[in-house]
Amino acid sequence: MTRLTRVSLWAAAAVMSVAVSASDASAQSLGVRAGASVDPDQFYFGGHYETAPLAEHVHFRPNLELGVGNDLTTVAVNLEVVYKAPLRRQPWTFYGGGGPAINFYDTDRGSDTEGGFNILGGLEHDKGLFFEVKFGLIDSPDLKFGIGYVFGK
C-alpha cells in the first residue's frame, strides 16, 4: 500500500468519525456497497455512513469506495447529501443527490489526487437493500453502477 493510499484512508476515517459523532446515534446507519465503474473501468467496494435527517428527507451520507482494475487503484472519498422520497404504499424509497469527491489515483507510474463531483440516484428497500447509479463530473469516475445494503433497517 502506497503512502498516498494510507494517507487517504486515514483522512477518510477522520471525516467519517466526525460525521458519526455529530449525529444522534439512534438515527444513524452504516452500509456496504460494491459495483462497477466506467472510465476508469474498475470494480469497487466500500462503505457509507448516513446521518439522522438534516432537514425533512435530507441526509448527509459520506462514503468511501476502493476501486481496483485497469492497472489503477482508486480511493474515492465522497461527501454526498441525499434527498429521500418514499414511494406511496411501497417498501421502496427513491433517493437523489450529490456532492464533492476527493479521488486518490495510484498506478505503477505514480499517484495523483483529484477533486470531483458526483450526481446520484437510487432505490432503497425498507429492509436495507439498495441500487445506485452515480454520474461523475470533473475528475470523478464517469459512471458507477452499485448495489449495497444498509444495516439496522
Q: Over which residues does each language-model region extend?
A:
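Transmembrane beta-strands of outer-membrane beta-barrel proteins
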Residues: 28-32, 60-62, 77, 94-98, ...
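Surface-exposed, polar helix/loop patches in the mature regions of secreted/periplasmic/lumenal proteins
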Residues: 91-93, 97-135
